[in-house]
Structures are given as structure tokens and as C-alpha cells.
Amino acid sequence: MAQFVFESDLHSLLQLDAPIPNAPVARWQRKAKEATGPAPSPMRAANRSHSAGRTPGRTPGKSSSKVQTTPSKPGGDRFIPQRSASQMEVASFLLSKENQPEDRGTPTKKEHQKAWSLNLNGFDVEEAKILRLSGKPQNAPEGYQNRLKVLYSQKATPGSSRKTCRYIPSLPDRILDAPEIRNDYYLNLVDWSSGNVLAVALDNSVYLWNAGSGDILQLLQMEQPGDYISSVAWIKEGNYLAVGTSNAEVQLWDVQQQKRLRNMTSHSARVSSLSWNSYILSSGSRSGHIHHHDVRVAEHHVATLSGHSQEVCGLRWAPDGRHLASGGNDNIVNVWPSGPGESGWAPLQTFTQHQGAVKAVAWCPWQSNILATGGGTSDRHIRIWNVCSGACLSAVDVHSQVCSILWSPHYKELISGHGFAQNQLVIWKYPTMAKVAELKGHTARVLGLTMSPDGATVASAAADETLRLWRCFEMDPALRREREKASVAKSSLIHQGIR
């Protein structure tokens, strides 16, 4: 019996087509097990180490193609982007919108939409920049390099490109004497009429200078010694001049007839600021009150605004007549409505960011909800406000007292008059508030600014008893001709409508 077992074992050992027991696993079998099965055990690794010096080259009958296995994680096709980051709905809407007819709309509808956009957003959406200035960005991490840096050109602007800057004379066009002008920051002593007549208050007198003919006329002189003129303001269209005095009076003069029409008394202290809104004359007093006067009726005092605790030194109606801005010695700026609300006369907005007296207040002529204000020596800032939202759009430290601010109707710029130490006028670009030019010449602080009716010349009155005329907003001749043609066409349409 043992003989048969021995023969069977011998036969199995000599048989070549049977698997060899305890032999190393073939390479193709080991690769297949590693791809589909668990990691090999230490025992199998030890068994393979005996035959590490000899590797079979090719297994008979086995194809050379590698066995394809299913990956454990889906890798994704690199030529197909992930749609989770794509705005497919927006793209579909834009593609479908291109096939629809364009909605041109009526001019009236477009004007209403633009007005709503200006009041709600503070800017026109159609003309706005995609990226708007919102503050200083955070610094990048140390060692960070922007991979998009190669997309931006480092070359200088070609010399053939058109220059965007214009020539601004650094010297005044004319210098007039202003003897005995009161060196008082809180007074408003100069104003330029639509008829091209400049009114200047010199102590107790008011003088008129006709810019066209050069004639000078003394309109009035205070009767009582010690009294003086504290403010002057022309009506928007006409020959009527309002005069505020130190004895709390508001006088109304017909300049053409050189006659005082009426004397309005309602204040208890000097009237340091005046502003017109059609037939309503608003006056600000040292008592902190603002009075509305209806110059058509005998009972002229129609309203009292109480929003300041000290002197109202800045007062200005908006060009559209919807808002009144007031600045006071209490460092407060109030924005008032044109009419009383449900709770009476209350300010729509109150700004308290200034740290000094606010005399300089000016409304943007092309954007009725934008207001510029300037603070005194303790503040030295110019701030731009959106009176609808109450937001401060920008604040610029000018390093000196701000006495007055004017907007240019021809350029998107504004000019400010300053005090110590340089007593200069500065032109700023809006809305970036970049400095365009500085006009120097006064030897004492600027007391007030006013602009000619054509918007080209600015008159500055200073404590050095001079009145300087600066032609800093001269309009381009081609642009002037275009505007003249547009005004003529508009007037002809009005006449046709009247007929």
C-alpha cells in the first residue's frame, strides 16, 4: 500500500503541467491580487524573498495586455469642467434675451428710470463702473504672487494719446480791492447774480460790480454806527438782492431801481446766511434758528426750523428745490425737506461726523442727492454725502480750514477755498477727489467763493482785502457751441409749444 502512495507522490512531482507547491507566485498573478485584493501578508512577503533574484519574463499562454481595474474614486474627465461653478441659469437667460426684440422704451420712461437709479443707488447704473472704490484692500500674504500679473501691461501711455487734463491758469484774471471787508468766518459776504453783477458786503455797505461793463455802484449803507452787513444773496433769476444785517434784519432790494422793497424782522440775532428757493427766502441766524420768508405776502414769516444749538453759518437750497442743507457752529449738518412732515419741521438727515464749524455747503448740480460739506479749523475735512441714504461717500483731509465749496457745472469737479497756512483754492476731481490744481495768491484766509453765471469764473474774497477772479473752469469752445445749439433748439421747441 505504501508503494502505491510513493508512486503517486513521485508521479505528481514529475508532472510539469501541474502547479508547483510552495513555489513563488507568478508576477502577473501577484499584480492582479494587489489590484483587487487586500495587501499581502508578511508570510507571503517572506516567501517571495527567496526568489527575489529571479523574475519570470513571460507566462506561457498569458496575454500581454494589462488587466483593467475599476478605480476606487471617480476621477472625472479633465476636458469637461464642473458645472457646479457655472451659472447655467444666467447664461440661459442671456441667450434667450438675445433673441427677443430690444425694448427701447420712451424717453420719459428712461428719464424716470435714471432718476430712480440716482436717488436709490447714488449713481447711474448704466454709466457706473463695474468695480467701485469701497476702501483700502487687504494686503496679500507674504510671498504671494498673482498669476494674472502677466495680463497687465507695464508700458507707459503712448505719447499720441489725447491728453485728458486741461490748462488752468495759476494766476487770477483780475484783482479787485475790497477794503474793510470783515474778517469773520461765519459771514457770507459775496454773491454773483444771473445778470452778471457781483455783490460784495464791505463792513456797513453793499457794493455792486458789473462784470460786463466794469461799473461799480454802492447800493446801501447802514444808518446806525456799529451795524454791519452779515450776508448777501441774489434771487436765482432777477434783480432782487437779499441782505442780512447784524441787527437781525433781512432786507429785500430791487437793484435795478436801487430801492429797498421791504424790511423783514423775525430773528433775534444777526443773520449770517441766506438762500433762495423761488419766492421762499431762508435765513440762518446766530441764535441757531432758520426762518422761511414768503416774500409775496405781508406775513412773510411762514416757518421756523430748529435744528442747531449755535450759529447757522452755511445755508443752501438744492437746485431742484427739494432739500435745504444747513451747517452750523455746533459741527452739525442738517438736511431739511421743502415742506413740513407729519410731525412738523424735522430734518431728514443729521450728519455729526465733522469736528468743527460747517460753513461750506454745496449741492451737486447734476446729481441732486449729492451734498459736499467742509469743516473749520478743528476738522479740516471735505465730506461728500448721499442725502437719500445718509451715507458718507468720501472724506478728504485737506489740512486747513474749509471756508467755501463750489461745484463746476461744466466739469465733474469742485473747488474749495481754505485758510491758514496757504490760503489757497483747490480744485478736486469728482468722485475720486484727486487734486487737480492749486490756485495761490491770497495772503490771508479765504472768506467766501462765488461763481459767475456762465460757470467759467470763480471769485474769491479774502481777509487780505482783495477780491480775485479765477478763470479756472473755462469751457472748451467746441463743447460750448454744442451746448448753445442745444439751448437754442430747446427754446425753439418751447416757442412752438406755446403757439
From Swiss-Prot:
Which pathway does UniProt place it in?
Protein modification; protein ubiquitination
Question: How does it get modified after it is made?
Answer: Acetylated. Deacetylated at Lys-66 by SIRT2; deacetylation enhances the interaction of CDC20 with CDC27, leading to activation of anaphase promoting complex/cyclosome (APC/C).
Q: Where in the cell is it found?
A: Cytoplasm, Cytoskeleton, Microtubule organizing center, Centrosome; Chromosome, Centromere, Kinetochore; Cytoplasm, Cytoskeleton, Spindle pole
**Alphabetized SUPFAM superfamilies for the sequence:** WD40 repeat-like (SSF50978)
Record-listed Phosphothreonine modification sites: T70, T106, T157
Cross-link Glycyl lysine isopeptide (Lys-Gly) (interchain with G-Cter in ubiquitin) per UniProt, renumbered positions: K485, K490
| Annotated region (Disordered), positions in chain | 27-82
Q: Which domain of life is it from?
A: Eukaryota
Q: Which InterPro entries match?
A: Cdc20/Fizzy, WD40/YVTN_repeat-like_dom_sf, WD40_CDC20-Fz, WD40_repeat_dom_sf, WD40_rpt
The GO terms this record gives for MF are: anaphase-promoting complex binding; histone deacetylase binding; ubiquitin-like ligase-substrate adaptor activity; ubiquitin-protein transferase activator activity
GO terms of biological process kind: anaphase-promoting complex-dependent catabolic process; cell differentiation; cell division; metaphase/anaphase transition of cell cycle; metaphase/anaphase transition of meiosis I; mitotic sister chromatid cohesion; mitotic spindle assembly; mitotic spindle assembly checkpoint signaling
Main location (coarse class): cytoplasm
Q: Where is the composition biased (Polar residues)?
A: 61-72
A matching Pfam family: WD40_CDC20-Fz
CC annotations in GO: anaphase-promoting complex; centrosome; cytosol; kinetochore; mitotic checkpoint complex; nucleoplasm; perinuclear region of cytoplasm; spindle pole
The entry's keywords: Acetylation, Cell cycle, Cell division, Centromere, Chromosome, Cytoplasm, Cytoskeleton, Differentiation, Isopeptide bond, Kinetochore, Mitosis, Neurogenesis, Phosphoprotein, Repeat, Ubl conjugation, Ubl conjugation pathway, WD repeat
N6-acetyllysine sites (modified residues):
K66
PTM-bearing positions, type Phosphoserine: S41, S72, S92, S153, S161
WD repeats located where? Answer: 182-221, 224-263, 266-303, 307-346, 353-395, 397-438, 441-480
Which protein family is it in? Belongs to the WD repeat CDC20/Fizzy family.
Q: State its role.
A: Substrate-specific adapter of the anaphase promoting complex/cyclosome (APC/C) complex that confers substrate specificity by binding to substrates and targeting them to the APC/C complex for ubiquitination and degradation. Recognizes and binds the destruction box (D box) on protein substrates. Involved in the metaphase/anaphase transition of cell cycle. Is regulated by MAD2L1: in metaphase the MAD2L1-CDC20-APC/C ternary complex is inactive and in anaphase the CDC20-APC/C binary complex is active in degrading substrates.
PANTHER family per UniProt: CELL DIVISION CYCLE 20 CDC20 FIZZY -RELATED (PTHR19918), CELL DIVISION CYCLE PROTEIN 20 HOMOLOG (PTHR19918:SF3)
How this chain assembles, per its entry, is:
Component of a complex with CDC20, CDC27, SPATC1 and TUBG1. Interacts with NEUROD2. Interacts with dimeric MAD2L1 in its closed conformation form. Interacts with BUB1B. The phosphorylated form interacts with APC/C. Interacts with NINL. May interact with MAD2L2. Interacts with CDK5RAP2. Interacts with SIRT2. Interacts with isoform 1 of NEK2. Interacts with HSF1 (via phosphorylated form); this interaction occurs in mitosis in a MAD2L1-dependent manner and prevents PLK1-stimulated degradation of HSF1 by blocking the recruitment of the SCF(BTRC) ubiquitin ligase complex.
Provide the protein name: Cell division cycle protein 20 homolog
Gene (UniProt)? Cdc20
